[in-house]
Regions:
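Active-site-proximal betaalpha loop/short-helix elements
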Residues: 114, 201-268
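Glycine-rich anion-binding loops of enzyme active sites
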Residues: 65-66, 73-75, 103-187, 299-301, ...
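Acidic, Ser/Thr/Pro-rich beta/coil linker or hinge segments at domain junctions
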Residues: 2-14, 22, 26, 290-338
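N-terminal glycine-rich phosphate/pyrophosphate-binding loops that anchor nucleotide-derived ligands
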Residues: 1-90, 94-99, 135, 172-173
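Small-aliphatic-rich amphipathic alpha-helix that forms the alpha element of a beta-alpha
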Residues: 81-108, 121-132, 207-213, 229-235
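Beta-strand->loop->alpha-helix junctions that form or flank phosphate-binding loops
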Residues: 47-50, 143, 243-254, 284-311
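Helix N-cap motif at beta-to-alpha junctions
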Residues: 274-281
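General beta-strand structural signal in soluble alpha/beta enzymes
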Residues: 47-51, 59, 67-69, 136-140, ...
Length: 338
């Protein structure tokens, strides 16, 4: 095997064993448990976006969509980083809304703590993020007699035109966008490009997503989650019933950050979009105009596999949806992309 083949094989093994992708795989059991035969719940029923997307999307009588999302946080993270956990509770929900082509309206939270003092840094973190992103915290639930701190945060928003995980098509470009104006929140693989950044800049950077949707430049996107770039791409491809090839050599990353770590990173501002040839230059130009890193890293196809390459020197299959589901949210019937 060549050096590139050895490196790529190691990357594939590492990604398949990663906790980020494993956590996403847990979604499949939940989808099966909540689906009722005959009612279409597993595919979204009457809702605009099927189960498995970054937000639920409910059509509004007057047009547009009501968006709903929720995040829960690992207890160890909440215990070690209470202020940052509170901040992330708002930040990641805001990102989910924008990833769907929407704009946030309000946040609610569920916070359990040992007492009022233990809850304070979590509340302060949420308040700081709410001010940064101009999203009010309008209510929630609290329990100050718990044996530990636990946090979950939910959000609602509105979208005029959706970006979804279910509308990528074969023959499109996989485009990623990142904000490199940050640093790792050590020791975690969290690239923090939000705390301390100018709030006006953060909000304007996020506004690119609904503008791209409303201008008809793209219909499919996801925010890059704890599953990293490859894991997020897997979810997008599975939901759309397609495959892709991604060239890891084309993946932009901050100076000095090893590829292996960047592939495992939650980037705070990071999105993957599936874009037609006719619009790819316009989409990239919008991100770059705001000093955001943006690049085409791959091409979608009808093969229902995600294959990785390293500058064309090696090729390996990360996931074959013909053999194994990940989150279990593929189209109910095999998609005809002929």
């Amino acid at each position: 095997m060549s050096a590139a083949e050895i490196e790529l094989a190691h990357i594939v093994r590492t990604l398949r064993a990663s906790s980020g992708i494993a956590h996403k795989g847990d979604i499949a059991q939940v989808v099966r448990a909540l689906a009722t035969p005959g009612d279409g719940a597993a595919r979204g029923g009457a809702w605009a976006a099927p189960v498995g997307d970054d937000c639920a999307a409910i059509p509004c009588d007057g047009g547009g969509y009501l968006l709903l999302a929720i995040e829960g946080f690992v207890n160890e993270f909440v215990a070690r980083e209470p202020w940052f956990a509170g901040y992330c509770g708002v930040m990641v929900n805001v990102s989910d809304i924008y990833a769907m082509g929407g704009r946030p309206l309000a946040v609610v939270d569920a916070l359990w703590s040992r007492d009022g003092d233990a809850a304070l840094p979590l509340l302060q973190g949420m308040a700081a993020a709410a001010e940064t992103y101009r999203v009010p915290i309008v209510g929630g639930h609290s329990n100050r007699r718990s044996d530990r701190e636990q946090l979950s945060v939910a959000i609602t928003g509105r979208a005029n035109r959706l970006l979804t995980s279910f509308d990528a098509l074969p023959g499109q470009n996989l485009v990623v966008a990142f904000d490199f104006r940050g640093a790792y929140h050590e020791p975690y693989d969290y690239w923090n490009a939000s705390v301390g950044a100018p709030p006006e800049r953060l909000r304007a950077d996020l506004e690119l997503l609904p503008a791209i949707a409303e201008d008809g430049l793209c219909a499919a996107a996801k925010d890059i989650s704890m599953a990293g770039v490859a894991g997020t791409a897997l979810m997008l491809l599975e939901c759309s019933g397609i495959g892709a090839t991604i060239d890891l050599a084309a993946l932009p990353r901050p100076d000095g950050v090893p590829l292996a770590r960047w592939l495992a990173t939650f980037p705070s501002y990071g999105f993957i979009l599936s874009v037609d040839d006719a619009h790819v230059d316009a989409v990239a130009a919008r991100f770059r105009s705001r000093e955001l890193a943006c690049a085409v890293i791959g091409r979608t196809d009808a093969g229902r596999k995600l294959q990785l390459t390293l500058g064309g020197q090696a090729r390996a299959t990360l996931w074959d949806f013909n053999q194994q589901a990940l989150i279990g949210c593929a189209p109910a019937k095999e998609t005809d992309h002929a």
